[in-house]
Amino acid sequence: MTAPTVPVALVTGAAKRLGRSIAEGLHAEGYAVCLHYHRSAAEANALSATLNARRPNSAITVQADLSNVATAPVSGADGSAPVTLFTRCAELVAACYTHWGRCDVLVNNASSFYPTPLLRNDEDGHEPCVGDREAMETATADLFGSNAIAPYFLIKAFAHRFAGTPAKHRGTNYSIINMVDAMTNQPLLGYTIYTMAKGALEGLTRSAALELAPLQIRVNGVGPGLSVLVDDMPPAVWEGHRSKVPLYQRDSSAAEVSDVVIFLCSSKAKYITGTCVKVDGGYSLTRA
């Protein structure tokens, strides 16, 4: 184990998009970073190599499925026995301590996002078959797992490892950031389970901030609006969304969101906890 001389950040979903920007920003601020990924191994390993080229021994990658399914794999598991989500989350935090002896920042960024309509019948108008119901249960486990339950287990593991660390080995600035959604109170049609999960994450942010305040661990949320838009939506649809953003009539860049995360992780925000900051250009003020 390397002597714990620099602060360490664990970023989930760090291989691409917002997660990558957050990890790069924290690394630029002097953090060593643990880059979690699920399926994006090539991207995560490439980012780790880039960061280690800038500063040796400053980045590692760890794979884990954060859906709430007991049989999902974990790095190093032989697959012979189910591995619970609780265990997977504990192992992510443990990876930071194994490699660097500490974990100062946790960013819960990993998030599944896709529609789960309440009313979805087959072509003949019948109720979904058993296979469809099983698919819905899997989607629920995935969406709630990545967006709410995994963040809870990760925060729990983060706090327990902090409490078990001798005072002389602790840092001076501990922060947890949950990536919420600026539009939770103006839900996107058909995304019911995702919206439920993000609402739960906001509640977790406030509750954990209250419970962990005596340990001087700050917990905040950052809620992007239109940010790093996906490639598979028709351009005309995205332009329609962009035109409704009061400020600049565009989506945010990844850096504009990650800059807020990095600020909330810094000592400049040491009196801020339990709040959720919207980074949406005012978009949540307009959509009914």
Swiss-Prot record:
Cleavable signal peptide: none
Residues the entry annotates as binding substrate: S175
Record keyword Nucleotide-binding present: no
Pathway per the UniProt entry: Cofactor biosynthesis; tetrahydrobiopterin biosynthesis; tetrahydrobiopterin from biopterin: step 1/1
Catalytic reactions on record: (6R)-L-erythro-5,6,7,8-tetrahydrobiopterin + 2 NADP(+) = L-erythro-biopterin + 2 NADPH + 2 H(+)
Annotated positions binding NADP(+): 17-40
One annotated GO biological process: response to methotrexate
Protein EC: 1.5.1.33
Active-site residue numbers: Y194 (proton acceptor)
One GO cellular component term: cytosol
Assembly information from the UniProt record: Homotetramer.
Family per record: Belongs to the short-chain dehydrogenases/reductases (SDR) family.
Function recorded in the entry: Exhibits a NADPH-dependent biopterin reductase activity. Has good activity with folate and significant activity with dihydrofolate and dihydrobiopterin, but not with quinonoid dihydrobiopterin. Confers resistance to methotrexate (MTX).
UniProt name for this protein: Pteridine reductase 1
Organism lineage: Eukaryota, Discoba, Euglenozoa, Kinetoplastea, Metakinetoplastina
Gene name of this polypeptide: PTR1
